[in-house]
């Protein structure tokens, strides 16, 4: 087959030694990362005191704005990964760092930890790339065919990304070992690969580097689930933007990438190349050099004459042709691939996918009402860069472009993500996300219910949210301020206030200070998510 890990910009991807948990940053374009302006501390409220020997004046605390740790890449204070996980043997090594087997101390469960050396992240673009990759992994985590993200940690020397351990090895290795797959096996794998593409596109992400090396098998079993693991070249899709930087790996790169004018359709092309290899054991466009490969891709002649193609079904060849159509506007979409007769008629039905958005909505409905209100405040202040993927999801679900999502639109949107919920379960999620109770989910409510928890870890977001409730700048959220907020958001009564105070007020002074508020937002004040059976 030749070397299938060449890059369009470099023959050495720097990723192969990392056991599928790759390092892709050297070929990625610079992305714009939001900068945050930290709010100034509020002026202390004016308080007049009458001096008394018996009652000395009490000065209310002033909540200082957060002070970020200098030179942090993740934008939050240093966090020692070794306080949660013990790092074990090396699994692989790449240009930017090392992947280790790690064990969660509390549970004994094993994961993979990619430790990226900060010394090697020399440029601003390198740091932005790491941030974006983590953001996309967090955004997509929770899907059946996407590796589960467990957490990101940063210390003085490294950024550590902990994720699901896939013990079955690379799909690429199995392809080489077998030479080719049966049509049934190829259809199963193709469905999983295209399902990843479909979910990425629905959630506003373009992968840009689909290839067998970037898929790992969850276990060593023959029918192990396939997991996409490497999102180092992925970007959030910007509506109307055509991308021009050449990225990807030589055999799998789409012709429009070489012409420097492309969109998300490139992922379907790459999946089509994978399907061709699954069926025949060789790539459709082959040459001794990268230039030769690129010339063959631009020429676009697909060989269906050599063995084993005469024995391959016409339906399979039809799907390959449609996925490898030169004109991206005429190329089949990922959703259409999944409906193609070769996949649809030859496959048993999939198990329901508990999608990322669904998982977060389940957690959201279990939160206390102060946390829901605070999330809404944070959501309304997030910038475009932070919510690109969720914005695309909202647009996809809001089919009538009304600016709100109805029950029917929510049900249809979740179905597109692969979830098979009953009407009662969808209604429960609808009621949870519909904070103001008007029967539909507006844009801010949707972002509030579905944004990933990592957004809450930024101190500046928590500080702004605390200031929103602390109207008199006293350094505390009082019962009166809580009551005012609940009335404004139409979210509760006196009993609700009592419940919130008792849950969050850990020092039992009848008020909520900034530390208690942060503890609640970072997890201390959230109940266990309810299970939908």
Curated annotation (Swiss-Prot):
Lipid attachment in record (N-myristoyl glycine): 2
Notes on the domains: There are 3 contiguous domains conserved in the CDPK subfamily: a kinase domain, an autoinhibitory (junction) domain and a calmodulin-like domain. The autoinhibitory domain (348-378) inactivates kinase activity under calcium-free conditions.
InterPro entries reported for this sequence: CDPK_Ser/Thr_kinases, EF-hand-dom_pair, EF_Hand_1_Ca_BS, EF_hand_dom, Kinase-like_dom_sf, Prot_kinase_dom, Protein_kinase_ATP_BS, Ser/Thr_kinase_AS
Keywords: ATP-binding, Calcium, Kinase, Lipoprotein, Membrane, Metal-binding, Myristate, Nucleotide-binding, Phosphoprotein, Repeat, Serine/threonine-protein kinase, Transferase
Organism from which the protein derives: Oryza sativa subsp. japonica
UniProt GO BP: intracellular signal transduction
Biased composition (Polar residues): 1-12, 24-38
EC annotation from Swiss-Prot or TrEMBL: 2.7.11.1
Protein's name in the database: Calcium-dependent protein kinase 19
């Amino acid at each position: 087959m030749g070397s299938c890990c060449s890059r369009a910009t470099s023959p050495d991807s720097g990723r192969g030694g990392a056991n599928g948990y790759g390092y892709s940053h050297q070929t990625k374009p610079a992305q714009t990362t939001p900068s945050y302006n930290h709010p100034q501390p509020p002026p202390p409220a004016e308080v007049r005191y009458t001096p008394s020997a018996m009652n000395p004046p009490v000065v209310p605390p002033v909540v200082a704005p957060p002070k970020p740790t200098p030179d942090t890449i993740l934008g939050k204070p240093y966090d020692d990964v070794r306080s949660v996980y013990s790092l074990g043997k090396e699994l692989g090594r790449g240009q930017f760092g090392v992947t280790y087997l790690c064990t969660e101390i509390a549970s004994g469960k094993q994961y993979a930890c990619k430790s990226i050396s900060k010394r090697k992240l020399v440029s601003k673009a390198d740091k932005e790339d790491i941030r974006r990759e983590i953001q996309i992994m967090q955004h997509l985590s929770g899907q059946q065919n996407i590796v589960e993200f467990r957490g990101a940690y940063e210390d003085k020397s490294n950024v550590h990304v902990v994720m699901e351990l896939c013990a079955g090895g690379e799909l690429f290795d199995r392809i080489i070992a077998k030479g080719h797959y049966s049509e049934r096996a190829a259809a199963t794998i193709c469905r999983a690969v295209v399902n990843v593409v479909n979910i990425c596109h629905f959630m506003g992400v373009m992968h840009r580097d689909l290839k067998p090396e970037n898929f790992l098998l969850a276990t060593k079993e023959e029918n192990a689930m396939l997991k996409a693991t490497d999102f180092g070249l992925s970007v959030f899709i910007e509506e109307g933007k055509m991308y021009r930087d050449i990225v990807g790996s030589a055999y799998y790169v789409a012709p429009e990438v070489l012409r420097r004018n492309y969109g998300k359709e490139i992922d379907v092309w790459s999946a089509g190349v994978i399907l061709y290899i699954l069926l025949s054991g060789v790539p459709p466009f082959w040459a001794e050099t990268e230039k030769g490969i690129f010339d063959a891709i631009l020429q676009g002649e697909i060989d269906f004459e050599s063995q084993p193609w005469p024995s391959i079904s016409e339906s399979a060849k039809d799907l390959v042709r449609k996925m490898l159509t030169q004109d991206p506007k005429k190329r089949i979409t990922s959703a259409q691939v999944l409906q193609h007769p070769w996949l649809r008629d030859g496959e048993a039905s999939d198990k329901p996918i508990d999608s990322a958005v669904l998982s977060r909505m389940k957690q959201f409905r279990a939160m206390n009402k102060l946390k829901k209100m605070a999330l809404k405040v944070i959501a309304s202040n997030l910038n475009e860069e932070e919510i690109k993927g969720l914005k695309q999801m909202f647009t996809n679900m809001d089919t009538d472009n009304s600016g709100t999502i109805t029950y029917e639109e929510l049900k249809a949107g979740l179905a597109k993500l692969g979830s098979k919920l009953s009407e009662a379960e969808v209604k429960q999620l609808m009621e949870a996300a519909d904070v103001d109770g008007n029967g539909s989910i507006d844009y801010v409510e949707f972002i509030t219910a579905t944004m990933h928890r990592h957004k809450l870890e930024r101190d500046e977001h928590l500080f702004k949210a605390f200031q929103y409730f602390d109207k008199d700048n006293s350094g505390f959220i009082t019962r009166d301020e809580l009551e005012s907020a609940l009335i404004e958001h139409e979210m509760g009564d006196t009993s609700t206030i009592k419940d919130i105070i008792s849950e969050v007020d850990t020092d039992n002074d009848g008020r909520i200070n900034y530390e208690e508020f942060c503890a609640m937002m970072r997890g201390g004040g959230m109940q266990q998510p309810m299970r939908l059976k």
